[in-house]
């Protein structure tokens, strides 16, 4: 499992918990609101990093398309 920054781990945990609770993925706006961010640009950066590390996938043309690749995402924060 790739190393994650503390914030990446928090975002991944939030997405995972949201999907488990609601049976659908959060929007970028919902992620931003949860973390107190005024812009979704930062969320996009974190999501892209998680995608690059192979932990999530998303269809860039569809809303709420985030999917967890590995349900067991225990990793070391750096």
Language-model features: locations:
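Short, cationic-aromatic polyanion-contact patches
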Residues: 5-8, 22, 27, 61-78
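Pre-recognition alpha-helix immediately N-terminal to the DNA-recognition helix
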Residues: 10-17
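Helix-turn-helix DNA-binding helix
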Residues: 11, 42-43
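Alpha-helical DNA-recognition elements
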Residues: 17, 48-49
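A short alpha-helical element within helix-turn-helix/winged-helix DNA-binding domains
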Residues: 26-34
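Short, basic interhelical loop/turn and adjoining N-cap
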Residues: 36-42
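Glycine-centered, phosphate/nucleic-acid-interacting loop/turn motifs that mediate DNA/RNA or nucleotide
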Residues: 54
């Amino acid at each position: 499992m790739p190393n994650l920054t503390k914030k990446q781990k928090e975002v991944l945990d939030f997405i995972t918990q949201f999907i488990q609770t609601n049976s659908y993925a959060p929007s970028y706006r919902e992620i931003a609101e949860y973390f107190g961010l005024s812009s979704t640009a930062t969320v996009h950066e974190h999501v892209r990093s998680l995608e690059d590390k192979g932990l999530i996938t998303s269809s860039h043309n569809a809303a709420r398309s985030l999917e967890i690749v590995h349900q067991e995402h225990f990793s070391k924060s750096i």
